[in-house]
Structure formats: structure tokens, C-alpha cells
């Protein structure tokens, strides 16, 4: 989205000035979306939209930002497998669970561990970098944590082991088809009142994704990241060094070039939220999705700039 603004892709669609706001927390994004302070959430956890939809709120997932960003669950030396997490503490970034929590809950459940009764979740664990998490793991704040997708794989696995920890699972291996962790969402009134503008917004976003995916734009993306105020000290949840910035830029490959959501993964998320007790058993992810807009947008971008990566 930032690339779309910087490169004038929204202006190309005849849209008025588009402003990007970094709220810093998903619940703040949701509050702003509900109140009308923002019209689109470009980086929201899908489960939050599901929960709102199940309560009758007219919020919809339009497309994806991230379908399958890597996430590595690591454990202290005494935790050699997911099964060893029974009775242990697991760190997470936010109250209510950060991006990787639904995935970790799936892993626990598969190992026969109740994610609500047999482990303790410790919020505000900080950014998932090894530099930040090593001292917290060493002093026993928790025994497992998810590391950011902005490290190179498989190189990070060796770094984890050299630090004395164990690699317990990797999201891209357990869910190779993708597990959507960040989505684009809006309200029903926006869809009803401004359908053409919705497609134009999505076209701008898709072009921005494709620009970021193009490796020849690495230095321009780096400059954008370093120039923008992300609303959190240290560009993230703490120290964010050059290695992680390189990984952040490289992770653009996980932006979907058609803006679409991996529906199999989205269904996995919905099923975990049901098991979590956050959604009714009869909930269907389709009731909180409107993919027709992003499909039209992708078709128009392909027609104008070339499929599947033209921008």
C-alpha cells in the first residue's frame, strides 16, 4: 500500500488523496474501521473480521496482504517438541493473540494439548527477533516464542540452534499452501456506496504488491521502509536491525500478486477460531468475505499491465 501511494497508483485510478495510517495495533485498526475514521484495513488479522461478522457487524475480507509468511516456533533447551509445551508458557506479541497464535494453537491441538487449559500465554513478548527473545527465553519469561518471518530460511534454523534453542515448527512447512495472517477489509456501506472506488483501491494495492515483489525495486522499497513513520519505536516491537530489514524487504515475495486470499488457509483459521470458542460452530468464512472485487481488480490490472506480475 505504501508503494502504491508513493508511486501514484491510486492517482492513476482517479482516486482522491489516499492516506496510510499505521495504528500499531489490530484492535485500533478495527475501532477506526467501525467508526469510519478509516475506510479500509489493509493489514488486519482475519480472525478479527470473523469475530465481528459472527456478531452481526457488516465487515468483510476483500483480499490478502499475507497468505503464507514464514513463522518459526522455537523452544528452550528442555522443549524439544510441541508435546513438551504442556504446562509451559508461550510468548505472544499482543493481548488476544498475535499473528502466529492461531497457527501455534493448531499445533498444540494436533499434539493433544488444550491451548486454553494446558499452556499459559504471555502477551507483550516483543518483536520476534532472536536478539530480543534470547534473554527473555533464557530468564524463563516463557519457554516458546514465534520468530518473525523476516529472517531468511533455513539460515535462521542454524542461528536458533547456535543460541541453544530448538526449532519446534515452521509455518511454511506445516501449511505449505498458505495460512492467511493479514487481510484487507472494509465495511458493507463502502461496498454498497462506492463499488467502483473499491475496485480502484484494490487495483492500486495489487500494483503496489507487484512493485514490491519485483527485485529490481529493492532499494526503493528499503528507502520507503526507512522513511515512513510506523508508529512504534525501533520500527517494530523493539530493535529492528539491518538483517531484519533485509528480510522485511525480501518478504515482499509473500505479497499475493493477484491480491487474493488462499481460501483453504482461511478456512483453517475459521476452524481454529471455532475450536477456540470465538466463533459459533455454524460459522462459515464465506459470510465474511467478498472476493468479487479483488478478482475484478486483478483482471483489470492484468489487462492493463500484463499478467501475472505487471504493474
Language model features with spans:
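A generic structural signal for nonpolar/aromatic side chains embedded in well-ordered alpha-helices
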Residues: 4, 52, 156-159, 225, ...
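A generic alpha-helix surface/boundary motif
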Residues: 4, 45-46, 102, 184-185, ...
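Short, solvent-exposed loop/beta-turn-alpha elements that line the ligand-binding surface or hinge
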Residues: 12-14, 172-176, 251-261
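Short linear loop/turn motifs
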Residues: 18-22, 28, 120-123, 239-256, ...
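Conserved C-terminal helix/tail region of periplasmic/extracytoplasmic solute-binding proteins
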Residues: 267-311
